Amino acid sequence: MTRTIPGKPQLLAEVSDTSANTLELRSGEVTFEVEPEDDITAAQLGAVLRSTDGTASLSEISAKTGVAPDKLTTILLPAQIAGLLADRSTPEAESPMAVLSSVEHVVNKLLEELIFDGPFWRAILDHPEQVEPNVYYGFGLENWYFLSRESEFDSAILSYPSSDAIRTMANDFYHEEHRHDDIVVRAFEGLGISRQDLVSARPLSTTSALIKLLSWWARTDPLFFIATIGILEGRLEKAESEGAYYDSFLRAAAAAGIATHFVEPLRQHAKVNAGHDHGSVSREFFAALPPLPVGTEARLVGKAHLFVEAYAEFFNGILEYYGDPDRPLVRTIGTSPVTTTAGVENGRS
C-alpha cells in the first residue's frame, strides 16, 4: 500500500539528541532511536524532525533544511508507518453559498426545460379553462399525500451530525411544516372526500417515487436534500392588483372557475409558506454551514438532474391520471373509490 506523507506533517513525538549520531523520539511511554542514513547528516536529520511541527509544508521543510524532497519522504516514512505523523494542512474547501448557487443554476435551467415546458404546466399555463377539473383536484390531492408524508424526509435531518445550527434550524422548520396537511385537507370537504378517505388512499406512483427519493437523500446525502427544500416549497409571486400571494396554479384555478371552497384552503397554505419564507429555507441553511469539502459542488450538481426528473414526473403523472374524468379521484384500498364531486356542477363553480 502506498503511503503519502501529509502536506503539513506534525511529528507526534519529542525529539532529543542522545549522542553525536543518534536522536531519540519519545511518544508517551514509547521511545524510538533513529540514526541518519545514506548522505543525510545527524544535524540534517534533527533539523527535519524538529521542523516537522505542523506549520511548514514539505517544500518549506526542504528549503529550510537543505534536504531534497525525496529524501524527506525517506526520513519521514517510518514515522508515518508508526503513526507518529499528523496532517495539519488546511484542506481546500468550497463556499457553501457558492455550492448552492451552482446547484440552483442547474436546477432552475432543468425546471424550465423539464417542468414548466412539460405537459402539466403547459396545459395549466396556456389554457387553464380547458384542463379537466379533476386535474386541479388531483393536484391538490397529490400535494396532500406529499405533505402528509413529509415527516418521512424532513425528520431525517433533525439529527444533522456536524452542525448545531443546522439541527436547530431543521427543528424550527419541522415544527413550522407540521400539520400543514390539516390546512389542505379542507379543500376536499366540498368534494365529499374525508380525511379517512385520504388516509386509506394511495398516491400516484409518481408521487410515491418523489417521496421515497427525497427520503433516501435525506438519510444518505442530507446536504443535497436541504438544497431541494427551497424548490419544493416554491417561490410565490406577488399579485400587486390583489395584494396577496399566489402561485401559478392558484391563478390557473381561478381562471378555470374552480370552486372557491377548493381553492381557498390551498391559497391559505400558500400564504402560510410565504409568511415563513420557506422558499428561502435552503439558502438560510447553507448560509449557516462551515466551508464544505472540495468535491461537494460536483456531488450535489450531479444529483440535480434526477431530482428534477422525478419532480417533473410528479406533475406529469397528475395530468396523465386525473386528465381522464372517468377515473376515480381517490384510489382507495379495499373500498369503493370516490368518484363524485359532491354536487359541484362540471367540477367548476
What is each of the regions a protein language model found here?
Residues 280-349:
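Acidic, carboxylate-rich catalytic segments that either coordinate divalent cations
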Residues 130-160, 216, 224-244, 312-315:
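Alpha-helical bundle segments that constitute or directly flank the non-heme di-iron/ferroxidase center
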Residues 102-112, 175-264:
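Active-site-proximal alpha-helical scaffolds that flank and shape metal-associated catalytic sites
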